[in-house]
């Protein structure tokens, strides 16, 4: 077994950040060979640099690889790396500005769509009731006319529809969505025709007074519902952006590895050595 890994020092972390700013993420061998950083990072391998940079990126954004977390607010720090973190990850501010509820940071990993948006989509498909299904634009227009939604709702609506389709709650036919045939369509109960009863005017006035007295509470409840909807939308949007950033980071790392292998093959061929390439399973991005 090799020697145990030593804990990263603040000097090494700062050198890694400056190296990424100078050469870019994924250029680990280039950073190691740079005379400006090689004396400090001499005890670290390119794998160490890659893993440490990923940890720094996630900690700077306040997000993990699979969950959207609410960053904890702490006292001001005099660390010189705070400005570099803000420079490297400007998109993290968009997440921390969102006032998330206590349970908004729980990403539905089990494929469940939040009840509010799921109910909106099911209502839209039920009301539109197209035999061949409705497209995303038609569903969005219907929901926007009946509900107060966040400005980015149209952007993450396709992911909501895919989750519902994966859980067999709705069906996807080409680019259209519809309710499954097993969905029980609700029909209003038959209304009995009878002579209208004369209502008591005093009871009607009491009802009107009750709603008038409770109007501030209703307004507060509506405002709270709008804020919760906005927070949920921002949480899902932030998670999608984080997953895309992680995917791009993996692609950059794989590209760096391929370039390194190509350079080694070129060096061997230049020396007249015979190099044999063994095919491996293709990795999906």
UniProtKB/Swiss-Prot annotation:
UniProt entry keywords in alphabetical sequence: Chromosome, Coiled coil, DNA-binding, Nucleus, Telomere, Transcription, Transcription regulation
Residue stretches in coiled coil: 226-255
Example GO BP: nucleosome assembly
SUPFAM superfamilies the UniProt entry points to: Homeodomain-like, Winged helix' DNA-binding domain
Assembly and oligomerization: Forms a homodimer and heterodimers.
Similarity-based family: Belongs to the histone H1/H5 family. SMH subfamily.
Protein function: Binds preferentially double-stranded telomeric repeats, but may also bind to the single telomeric strand.
Domain notes: HTH myb-type domain confers double-stranded telomeric DNA-binding while the H15 domain is involved in non-specific DNA-protein interaction and multimerization.
Protein name: Single myb histone 3
Protein's organism: Zea mays
Organism ancestry: Eukaryota, Viridiplantae, Streptophyta, Embryophyta, Tracheophyta
């Amino acid at each position: 077994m090799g020697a145990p890994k030593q804990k990263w020092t603040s000097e090494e972390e700062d050198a890694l950040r400056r190296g990424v700013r100078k050469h870019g993420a994924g250029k680990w061998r280039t950073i190691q060979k740079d005379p400006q950083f090689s004396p400090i990072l001499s005890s670290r391998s390119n794998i160490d640099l890659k893993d440490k940079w990923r940890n720094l990126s996630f900690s700077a954004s306040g997000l993990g690889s699979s969950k959207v977390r609410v960053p904890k607010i702490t006292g001001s720090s005099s660390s010189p790396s705070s400005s570099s973190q803000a420079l490297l990850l400007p998109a993290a501010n968009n997440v921390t500005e969102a006032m998330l509820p206590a349970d908004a940071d729980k990403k539905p990993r089990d494929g469940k769509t939040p009840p509010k948006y799921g109910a909106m989509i099911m209502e839209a498909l039920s009301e539109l009731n197209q035999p061949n299904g409705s497209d995303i634009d038609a569903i969005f227009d219907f929901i926007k006319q009946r509900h107060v939604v966040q400005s980015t709702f149209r952007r993450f609506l396709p992911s909501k529809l895919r989750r519902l389709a994966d859980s067999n709650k709705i069906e996807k036919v080409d680019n259209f969505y519809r309710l499954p045939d097993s969905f029980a369509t609700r029909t209003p109960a038959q209304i009995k025709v009878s002579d209208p009863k004369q209502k008591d005017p005093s009871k009607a006035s009491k009802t009107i007074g009750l709603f008038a007295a409770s109007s501030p509470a209703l307004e507060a409840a509506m405002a709270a519902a709008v804020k919760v909807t906005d927070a949920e939308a921002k949480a899902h949007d932030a998670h999608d952006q984080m997953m895309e950033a992680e995917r791009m980071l993996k692609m950059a790392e794989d590209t760096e590895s391929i370039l390194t292998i190509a350079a080694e093959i070129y060096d061997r061929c230049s020396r007249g050595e015979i190099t044999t390439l063994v095919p491996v399973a293709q990795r999906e991005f």
